[in-house]
Amino acid sequence: PGGSDGIFVFSAAAAGLAVGACVTVTGTAKEFNGLTELDKPTITPKADCAPVLPTALTTLPVSDADKEQYEGMLVAPQGTYTITNNYALNQFGQVGLAVGDQPLYQATDVVAPGAAAAEYEAENLKKYITLDDGSSWDYMRNTTAQGSPLPYLSQEEPMRTGSQVTFAKPVILDYRFQWNYQPTGQIVGATDADDPLTTENDREATPPAVGGNLKLAAFNVLNYFTELGEDEDEFKNCPYYADREGDPVTTNFCEVRGAWTDAAFEDQKAKLMSAVNGLGSSVVALMEIENSAGVTWVDRDRDYTLREFVDSLNAAGGHWAYVPSPVVTPATEDVIRTAFIYNPDLVRPVDTSYIQMDSAFANARYPLAQRWQAPKSSTQFVTVANHFKSKSSGDDDGTGQGLSNPSREAQAHALTSWTSQMWPAKPIFLMGDFNAYSKETPVSIIESAGFTELEKKYEPTSATYQFSGRLGSLDHVFANQSALSLVTGAGVWDINADESIAMQYSRRNYNVTDFYTTSQFASSDHDPVVVGLQVRVPSQK
């Protein structure tokens, strides 16, 4: 009682056995990286035996000790699971699952940093298990694996985080680096007979309905660079990430950060054109678009790539203009920047744009502000595009909010102080990638200055980003009290963060299955945030 009735047999001879074959196995049990197995066994065929029936798992065992009672056994997981991690699907054929009808969220997107966040994450861990593909293949490095279709994934079954699954077939509970459900055979492609899952396709064809007669959007476009890696390579060495045939696709820590070849750039562009034109927005704040003046090996003005972006959008059926950079710009800047594009039929810029050249943003992107007015409307409002310091480098303040959190706090203070001084009586929207989850201190600083975070107000469980099997919002739109009276709704268009990275242009031809399409899905790694506004026009009473 309390012991497992199954065990993994480590033997080359086992490869010739079919599921359901009867054998007698003798050997020495041992532990290998946490997995109990029989080593150097003797395997003898047997005439008959009792059938192996799966043991129902009505709930996922929580502790290691509880799971070990079922280790190596055929089990039938019951109820609903939700995909919460698909990042390793592209490399190891693995899907992270959470028990229940919700994915797992970043703790600091839900509760305050510190003890509450630690407690929240401890509960996350109790709900998590990986579904493996029945193999140890590395689809990024193993050439045989690259020539075999990725398991589980297709356009029809995109295996998005947040989508719900149930188990239609039994699996084996085992331990390899972490606790896993293993199918009873290797999964090859999306329609393998041993695939144990029933899945759903919950892709959203259109943005959320947010009402109003104007729409704002904030969108990180994932390093959109017209300057290519192959061009930089003519001036200085520019390493690249290659597909399965060794052909370059994207840059690898070069000065430019996007596509390496023109073909890859066209793939990237087509997806972004579908996404941005599909937003139907009046004003879009862009993050991670090339700052052409910051590329040292070409002589471009700051707006060169922004103009190209707008020209491409219009060639694809859009109707856009861009906000030119102001005359005075920072002396030194990052090679990526923020920008505004807009539909000139719906809204017009008032005066020039402004860049907040505060030293707090020296390690990030300087905020870009623009005042707007709709034709025939007396209402003016201000939007500020932001891209705070990332979590990937800098000092750790020990609060569990990622690296460089003090920098983001200083940026939040500087931003709110500047905007309140510049436009004390105007509706103000702070938009963009703040690199801070919804309960982290930079967000709290902005809210304490009188701003309301809109997507959580209207969609409390929304998320714009996926990292390490957890969902959360790094991208936000904040409204001050005056702006809040204009807002009719807000939401996240879930087209990117939930998608497998295999669907992105940057992974094209990494596998024999071509997952690339020109659709909006996986056009970036961040989801756009959309906000509806109602501004008065003369016909309204």
Language-model region placement:
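Active-site His/acidic residue clusters
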Residues: 379, 385-405
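Sec-exported extracytoplasmic/periplasmic mature domains
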Residues: 25-34, 40-48, 80, 84, ...
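N-terminal, active-site-proximal structural segment of metallo-dependent hydrolase catalytic domains
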Residues: 190-338, 374, 396-416, 497-521, ...
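Solvent-exposed loop/turn segments at secondary-structure junctions
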Residues: 14-16, 30-33, 44-45, 82, ...
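Metal-dependent phosphoester-hydrolase catalytic domains
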Residues: 152-157, 161-169, 173-181, 187-203, ...
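Extended non-catalytic accessory segments flanking core domains
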Residues: 1-249, 356-366, 408, 413, ...
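Extracytoplasmic/secreted proteins, especially bacterial periplasmic and envelope-associated proteins
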Residues: 22-24, 74, 78, 170, ...
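Structural recognition of the beta-strand scaffold that forms the well-ordered cores
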Residues: 8-9, 25, 37, 75-77, ...
